[in-house]
Structures are given as C-alpha cells and as structure tokens.
C-alpha cells in the first residue's frame, strides 16, 4: 500500500489549505489515481489496523439495498451512526441507488443485477457502470455519496473495476473505500466466472483534515507490511447471497491502530 502512503505524503506536503462543510479545514489536492493489481495481494492498509468487520458488513449492507443502520448496529458497526436520523434511517443512499434507482415512470432499476447480467452476456460492453449520484434524490440523503460511480471492465478473463470518488478523506475514509471496492471486485469476479484483475481508484478532492495531520505524520513513519490474501467461499455463486462468514482475509499483518476524530 505504498501508493496510499505516497498520496498521503503528497497531500500533507503539497496540499492547498481549504475550508470545508464541516468547518474543520483541510489540506487538499484535486485529481489522483492509484492502481492495485489484485493478484498481488488484497489492498488493505497495513500501516495501521483497520476494522475489517466494519468494511465487510458495510458492503453486504450496501448490496442488500438497505438504508437503515439496524443491520450495522446488530453486527457491531457504528460508522454510519452520526448521520442516521432518530429512526436509524439515512435516506436513499448507496445501497438504495445501486439496487433500486427510481425512474421517471415510477419503475425501479436494479443497477447491480443489470451489470451482472451484462458482464455475463456482453463482457466487452463499455456500459458496466453503477452510479450512486442521483441528483434528484441528493436532498433526501443523509450524506451525498462520496464514492459516486464505478465501472467494470473485462479483458482476457479478468475483471477490473474503476471507482470515481468525488471526495476522499484520506486518513479515515479512504482505506475503507479501497478495501470495500477491492472486495466487491473479487466477489463480482467469482460469481461471473472471472479472475480478479485490477482495482483502479480515481479521486477528485483528496484531502487530509487539519485535525488528522499529527496522525498522518505518525502513519507516514511506518513501513508497509506484506499484503494479505482474500479468501471467498467458492460455493457462493450469487452476489447477493454472500454472508460475513463467506469472506476471510488471511495473513493480515498490521501496525497498531491510530485514532482520529470523524468530521461530520
């Protein structure tokens, strides 16, 4: 994960000071890309410990099309608590848009199911896209999507995925996003009888919050460790049938965690 540390160092030393919605302040750069060859290990940050349970359960929650944090709370995941309303709801965020995008004539489009079908039937298509950025429903979302659009690409029997992320909280959020979409790529590859290829991350506003700078400096002093390997239950052939126990990361070596406040 040297590429991640390189981005962090670049923003730390060359980022432009900017104000932001939360009132915290950031150092920011605009436009950056990282590529991860999934055959060389699973791209999870090793220079601090990540809460893998949260990453896995959040992705399964997205895939279910849910927008209420009850499932997350039941599984010990609190990363969405600050944005939920008194009933635990977040509005039509990621999972709703992925699985139930509303159309003008009142229908609902399951973008993920459509992409899975097209990957199997038309792998060379250039239309394997899923978007969470529904302009008409942004006002009803607890938080507009930071990771907004992803596209799959098939070549020589390998599935790659590129994510466009409009806003990237480098210290806290980005390690989760990279691991989550790398996991999704592995899962989609398995159910489509493909091998994992690359995960390409493209960021818009890439920033470090000013109250994360000390933590970033500490992390930048640490040496990356070897990447772990992802193991999926090979019997799962339906993307929406994966459960937590079907997913395992083997050999995850990491440095100690580094705590930092969330900007809300």
Swiss-Prot record:
Key words of the record: Cytoplasm, Methyltransferase, Nucleotide biosynthesis, Transferase
Location(s), subcellular: Cytoplasm
* Leading EC class: transferase
E.C. numbers: 2.1.1.45
Q: Which family does it belong to?
A: Belongs to the thymidylate synthase family. Bacterial-type ThyA subfamily.
Binding-site residues for dUMP, renumbered to this chain: 21, 126-127, 166-169, 177, 207-209
Q: Which PANTHER family match?
A: THYMIDYLATE SYNTHASE, THYMIDYLATE SYNTHASE 1
| Residue positions binding (6R)-5,10-methylene-5,6,7,8-tetrahydrofolate | 51, 169, 263
The record lists the catalysed reaction(s) as: dUMP + (6R)-5,10-methylene-5,6,7,8-tetrahydrofolate = 7,8-dihydrofolate + dTMP
Instruction: Give yes or no: UniProt keyword Cytoplasm.
Output: yes
Q: Where is the active site?
A: 146 (nucleophile)
Q: Has the keyword Transferase been applied to this entry?
A: yes
| Gene Ontology BP terms | dTMP biosynthetic process; dTTP biosynthetic process; methylation
Q: Which GO terms describe its cellular component?
A: cytosol
- Its name, as the record gives it, is Thymidylate synthase
Provide the primary localization. Answer: cytoplasm
Signal sequence, start to end:
none
Pathway given for this chain reads:
Pyrimidine metabolism; dTTP biosynthesis
Subunit field text: Homodimer.
Q: Name one GO molecular function term.
A: thymidylate synthase activity
Please give the function described in this protein's UniProt entry: Catalyzes the reductive methylation of 2'-deoxyuridine-5'-monophosphate (dUMP) to 2'-deoxythymidine-5'-monophosphate (dTMP) while utilizing 5,10-methylenetetrahydrofolate (mTHF) as the methyl donor and reductant in the reaction, yielding dihydrofolate (DHF) as a by-product. This enzymatic reaction provides an intracellular de novo source of dTMP, an essential precursor for DNA biosynthesis.
């Amino acid at each position: 994960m040297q590429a991640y540390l390189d981005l962090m160092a670049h923003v730390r030393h060359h980022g432009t000071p900017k104000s932001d919605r939360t009132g915290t302040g950031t150092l920011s750069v605009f436009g950056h890309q990282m590529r991860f060859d999934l055959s060389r290990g699973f791209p999870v940050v090793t220079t601090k410990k990540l809460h893998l349970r949260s990453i896995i359960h959040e992705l399964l929650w997205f895939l279910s099309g849910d927008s209420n944090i009850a499932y997350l709370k039941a599984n010990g995941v609190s990363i969405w608590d600050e944005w939920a309303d008194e009933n635990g709801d977040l509005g039509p965020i990621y999972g709703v848009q992925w699985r139930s995008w509303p159309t003008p004539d009142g229908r609902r489009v399951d973008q993920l199911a459509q992409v899975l079908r097209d990957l199997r039937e038309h792998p060379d298509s250039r239309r394997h896209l899923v978007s969470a950025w529904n302009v008409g429903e942004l006002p009803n979302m607890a938080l507009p999507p930071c990771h907004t659009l992803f596209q799959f690409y098939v070549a020589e029997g390998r599935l790659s995925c590129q994510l466009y992320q409009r806003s990237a909280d480098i210290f806290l959020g980005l390690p989760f996003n990279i691991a989550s979409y790398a996991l999704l790529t592995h899962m989609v590859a398995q159910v489509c009888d493909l091998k994992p290829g690359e995960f390409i991350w493209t960021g818009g506003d890439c920033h470090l919050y000013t109250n994360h700078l000390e933590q970033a400096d500490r992390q930048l002093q640490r040496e990356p460790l070897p990447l772990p390997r992802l193991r999926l239950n090979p019997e799962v052939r339906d993307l929406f049938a994966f459960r937590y126990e079907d997913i395992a990361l083997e050999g995850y070596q990491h440095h100690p965690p580094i705590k930092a406040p969330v900007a809300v």
